[in-house]
């Protein structure tokens, strides 16, 4: 009958266990024994290198037929072996055989005994023939080489461009008496004509002050400062960015002259030349400037090398291509040494210029991502797998190569791949390997293009060369050339690359684990199959020695078996409870001196209350119904027999004591399965596109656009200068224009006149400003009040002088004369009665002469101013007057001098 998988799985274990036990018995029997020397246990320990333990002493045997022996105290643990000299002292304290058996049964309650009747041949079995084992999995077709991995180029094409435009600002201002107000500001940008760019800006570094442009289909012209057209010098911008420079013609906005209560207009034309960065992305049909302005024309458009087929959205007269163009640095005025082909395009808002270059090889849709020094290529089914431990990645491709002609704008792939491969080969493989053929290109999943250069070691190369020469000798001399490749007419395409490499890394991990597990399981399957075939031979031989054990291990339960030729007859064994089995304490045959049983005798019952059956203990807890296992008695007899869950020890054919399985050293028959554990592998960070590449992939750099727009006023305008409204500006402008028209003499006179007028205006303006100040008005008011007070007192003094000159001129003298306490005055008055007429006349004469002296001094002073003749006349008059004064005037003695001095 067929057996299940668990039974077949335990066969090899049982066979090796039997062989191990047989080896142990042979070693024990071959070891020399003497009285007092241990038996099997000693042999086992000696074989293991340990010290020999003395055998325990023989115990007194209990009566054979007594099923219920006298109960003594039960020890908790098995009694350890004791020296032979202590047998007489410890014999009384040992437990009987049945008590020890009960202890064994209590410790191993799951140990059962079996009664196996002899097979009759009703059921026969045979062993399976050896199986054919699977072959060892062969390795894949691995090829080592160098690889360069390309990814989609998401970076835009960048180039330098120059913008030419004129900022036109028209401001409307209303001027009041004390303030001005903007009523409107119109701002626009006008392109610079081609002729002005070439003949004025690039040739001389100047720009016209007018801007002529079209708005609403009407051509209009703006004049800077509302004046005639002139050439204005271009000067560098105030603040330059990191990536561009700029030049312009004016800093300040022009405001109209002040005329109160009128609306005035002023025009400013600022010519600006600005270097900017330009960007264009695939398919390069347009480009955008750093200012945010779009140009709907391919940067590769032109009239050379078929570039006129590129995209453009402008009319032909708006574009111009100049060959042999020498650019000029507007800061240093230096001219470029090498000519270029210059493209110029005018738009409604600006004119842009850039250097023309051919489209190939200026741009490439693929870019190099990784250079891999060691790349293994293996074939799995219908695909190639490229694996590299350096980047922990596996790429899956088709078996066919990918033609580079299908890659749109892929001229850089072959050159970059060859350069990188040559550099790696020269550095690492030049002395050990050779290149096999030309680089091969494969398109991997995810949009990665792999350039692969197979390598071959020098040793293998010699073998392949010899084989190749043999193959070439067998080929026909003129082979048919292959048909032209279909890729010549294949349509081009752009390869799209994913932004994540995680799928390739997962593929690498899966391949790594799959390769390891498959190899390990393959080795296990082969070893298992070969082991089963080897064990089958042992099973066939072992069944002849012990068919019961072989049959039980094969069937999976306890059976009895015997060989019937080449087949084995089996019968089922009957289980017997451990409590119903009793072992006898002696193995000697009383009726036959010198003969002993080779196995212990037992008594058992099939059921608890059944009759007692006599038998013999077989191997592996088998209860034999016969007692025919006999052998001659020997001196130094020591045996261990399996009994339930432990062992019973017989010495000199008599029971000694019991042992548990843990007391016996175990010799393992298992074969260790050598399985290589999965090695550790660390993943390195890997990015397809860096943060900078993703940020730079767009057509517009919004950060740069915002920066430039916010810096525009700072670069091309003076934001710190403040122009105040001036009411006299119109008058000065008119005077200046009047004198300018009179030539050089008029300009000289105009400067003098305008200087005088400016001084007067400044003085008046200063006074007006001082009066408009609150503190100034207060000071003027105080000065006016002080002046009025001074005028009042002066007027009063003059009136007093006219009414009473003496009192006004000599107030103290007059006061003394009127004082009645003066004795001189009172006495003289009383004596004379009135004033002295002579003195009064003299006083009048003195006053008259004083007036005459004053008149003479004035005459002399005027004569000095007029000249010599007047001075002589004044001298003559003075002499005449002196002559008269000497004749008529006589000095009056001063009689009252002392009195006057006392009064004073």
Swiss-Prot record:
Highest rank taxon of the organism: Viruses
Compartments reported by the entry: Virion membrane; Host cell membrane; Host endosome membrane; Host Golgi apparatus membrane
Short sequence motif named Internalization motif, residue ranges: 889-892
Record keywords: Disulfide bond, Glycoprotein, Host cell membrane, Host endosome, Host Golgi apparatus, Host membrane, Host-virus interaction, Membrane, Signal, Transmembrane, Transmembrane helix, Ubl conjugation, Viral attachment to host cell, Viral envelope protein, Virion, Virus entry into host cell
GO term, biological process aspect, one: virion attachment to host cell
Post-translational modifications reported in the UniProt record: The cytoplasmic tail is phosphorylated by the viral kinase US3. Phosphorylation may be linked to a down-regulation of gB expression on cell surface. ubiquitinated.
Residue spans, topological domain Virion surface: 31-774
Region described as Hydrophobic membrane proximal region: 719-772
Region (Involved in fusion and/or binding to host membrane): 173-179, 258-265
Any one GO CC term of the record: viral envelope
Gene3D superfamilies hit by this protein: 1.20.5.1890, 2.30.29.100, 2.30.30.1230, 6.10.250.3280
InterPro entries: Glycoprot_B_PH1, Glycoprot_B_PH2, Glycoprot_B_PH2_sf, Glycoprotein_B_ecto_C, Herpes_Glycoprot_B
Disulfide bonds: 116-573, 133-529, 207-271, 364-412, 596-633
Start-end of Pro residues biased regions: 476-485
UniProt keyword annotation of Membrane present: yes
Membrane topology annotation: Single-pass type I membrane protein
Biased composition annotated in UniProt, kind: Low complexity: 31-65
SUPFAM superfamilies associated with the record: Viral glycoprotein ectodomain-like
Main location: virion
Signal peptide feature range: 1-30
Transmembrane regions: 775-795
Region (Disordered), start-end ranges: 31-88, 470-492, 883-904
Stated family: Belongs to the herpesviridae glycoprotein B family.
Function text: Envelope glycoprotein that forms spikes at the surface of virion envelope and binds to the host cell entry receptors MYH9/NMMHC-IIA and MYH10/NMMHC-IIB, promoting the virus entry into host cells. Essential for the initial attachment to heparan sulfate moieties of the host cell surface proteoglycans. Involved in fusion of viral and cellular membranes leading to virus entry into the host cell: following initial binding to its host cell entry receptors, membrane fusion is mediated by the fusion machinery composed at least of gB and the heterodimer gH/gL.
Subunit-level organization: Homotrimer; disulfide-linked. Interacts with host receptor MYH9/NMMHC-IIA. Interacts with host receptor MYH10/NMMHC-IIB. Binds to heparan sulfate proteoglycans. Interacts with gH/gL heterodimer.
Identification of the protein by name: Envelope glycoprotein B
Organism, as annotated: Human herpesvirus 1 (strain Patton)
């Amino acid at each position: 009958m067929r057996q299940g998988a668990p039974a077949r799985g335990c066969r090899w274990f049982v066979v090796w266990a039997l062989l191990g036990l047989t080896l142990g018995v042979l070693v024990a029997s071959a070891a020399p024994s003497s009285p007092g020397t241990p038996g099997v246990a000693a042999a086992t320990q000696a074989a293991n290198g340990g010290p020999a333990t003395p055998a325990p002493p023989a115990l007194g045997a209990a009566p054979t037929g007594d099923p219920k022996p006298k109960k003594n105290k039960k020890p908790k643990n098995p009694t350890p072996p004791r020296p032979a000299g202590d047998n007489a002292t410890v014999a009384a304290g040992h437990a009987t055989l049945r008590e020890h058996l009960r202890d064994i049964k209590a410790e191993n309650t799951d140990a059962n005994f079996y009664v196996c009747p002899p097979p009759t041949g009703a059921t026969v079995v045979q062993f399976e023939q050896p199986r054919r084992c699977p072959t060892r999995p062969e390795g894949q077709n691995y090829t080592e080489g160098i690889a360069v991995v390309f990814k989609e180029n998401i970076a835009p094409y960048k180039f330098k461009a120059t913008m030419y435009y004129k900022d036109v600002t028209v401001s409307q201002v209303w001027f009041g008496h004390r303030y001005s107000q903007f009523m409107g500001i119109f701002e626009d940008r006008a392109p610079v004509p081609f002729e002005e760019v070439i003949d004025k800006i690039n040739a001389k570094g100047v720009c016209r002050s007018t801007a002529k442009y079209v708005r609403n289909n009407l051509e209009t012209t703006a004049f800077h400062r509302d004046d005639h057209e002139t050439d204005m010098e271009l000067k560098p911008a105030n603040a330059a960015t990191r990536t561009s420079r700029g030049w312009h013609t004016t800093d300040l906005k022009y405001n109209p002259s002040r005329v109160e209560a009128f609306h005035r207009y002023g025009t400013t034309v600022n010519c600006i030349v600005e270097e900017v960065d330009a960007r264009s992305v695939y398919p390069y049909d347009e480009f955008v400037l750093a200012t945010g302005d779009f140009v709907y024309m391919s940067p590769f458009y032109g009239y050379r090398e078929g570039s006129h087929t590129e995209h453009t959205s402008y009319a032909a007269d708006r574009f111009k291509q100049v060959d042999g163009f020498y650019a000029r640095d507007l800061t240093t005025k230096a001219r470029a040494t090498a000519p270029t082909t210059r493209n110029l395009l005018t738009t409604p808002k600006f004119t842009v210029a850039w250097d023309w270059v051919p489209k190939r090889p200026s741009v490439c849709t693929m870019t190099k991502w990784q250079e891999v020094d060691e790349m293994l290529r293996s074939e799995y089914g219908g695909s190639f797998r490229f694996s590299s431990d350096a980047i922990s990645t596996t790429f899956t491709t088709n078996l066919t190569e990918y033609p580079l002609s299908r890659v749109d704008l892929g001229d850089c792939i072959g050159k970059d791949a060859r350069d990188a491969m040559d550099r790696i080969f020269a550095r690492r493989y030049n002395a050990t390997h050779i290149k096999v053929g030309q680089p091969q290109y494969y398109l991997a999943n995810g949009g990665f293009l792999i350039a692969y250069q197979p390598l071959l070691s020098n040793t293998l190369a010699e073998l392949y060369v010899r084989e190749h020469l043999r193959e070439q000798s067998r080929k026909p001399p003129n082979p048919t050339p292959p048909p032209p490749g279909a890729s010549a007419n294949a349509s081009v395409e752009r390869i799209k690359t994913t932004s994540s490499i995680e799928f390739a890394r997962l593929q690498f991990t899966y391949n790594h684990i799959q390769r390891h597990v498959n190899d390990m399981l393959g080795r296990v399957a082969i070893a298992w199959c070969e082991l089963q075939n080897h064990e089958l031979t042992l099973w066939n031989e072992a069944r002849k020695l012990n068919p019961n054990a072989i049959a039980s291990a094969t069937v999976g339960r306890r059976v009895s078996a015997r060989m019937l030729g080449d087949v084995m007859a089996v019968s089922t064994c009957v289980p017997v409870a451990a409590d119903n089995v009793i072992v006898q304490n002696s193995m000697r045959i009383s009726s036959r001196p010198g003969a002993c049983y080779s196995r212990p005798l037992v008594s058992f019952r099939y059921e608890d209350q059944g009759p007692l059956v006599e038998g013999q203990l077989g191997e592996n807890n088998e209860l034999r119904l016969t007692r025919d296992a006999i052998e001659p008695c020997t001196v130094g007899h020591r045996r261990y027999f399996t009994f339930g869950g432990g062992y019973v020890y017989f010495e000199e054919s008599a029971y000694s004591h019991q042992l548990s399985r843990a007391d016996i050293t175990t010799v393992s028959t298992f074969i260790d399965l050598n399985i290589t554990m999965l090695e550790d592998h660390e993943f390195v960070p890997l990015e397809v596109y860096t943060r900078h590449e993703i940020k730079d992939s767009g057509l517009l750099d919004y950060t740069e656009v915002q920066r430039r727009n916010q810096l525009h006023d700072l670069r091309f305008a003076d934001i710190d200068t403040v122009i105040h409204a001036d009411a006299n500006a119109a008058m000065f402008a008119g005077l200046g224009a009047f004198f300018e028209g009179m030539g050089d003499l008029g300009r000289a006179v105009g400067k003098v006149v305008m200087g005088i007028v400016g001084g007067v205006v400044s003085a008046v303006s200063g006074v007006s400003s001082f009066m408009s100040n609150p503190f100034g008005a207060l000071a003027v008011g105080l000065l006016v009040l002080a002046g009025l007070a001074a005028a009042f007192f002066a007027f009063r003094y003059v009136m007093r002088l006219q009414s009473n000159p003496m009192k006004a001129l000599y107030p103290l003298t007059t006061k003394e004369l009127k004082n009645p306490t003066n004795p001189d005055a009172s006495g003289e008055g009383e004596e004379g009665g009135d004033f002295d007429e002579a003195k009064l006349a003299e006083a009048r004469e003195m006053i008259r002469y004083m007036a005459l002296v004053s008149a003479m001094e004035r005459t002399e002073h005027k004569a000095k101013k007029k000249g010599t003749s007047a001075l002589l006349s004044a001298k003559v008059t003075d002499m005449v007057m002196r002559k008269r004064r000497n004749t008529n005037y006589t000095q009056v003695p001063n009689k009252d001098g002392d009195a006057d001095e006392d009064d004073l």
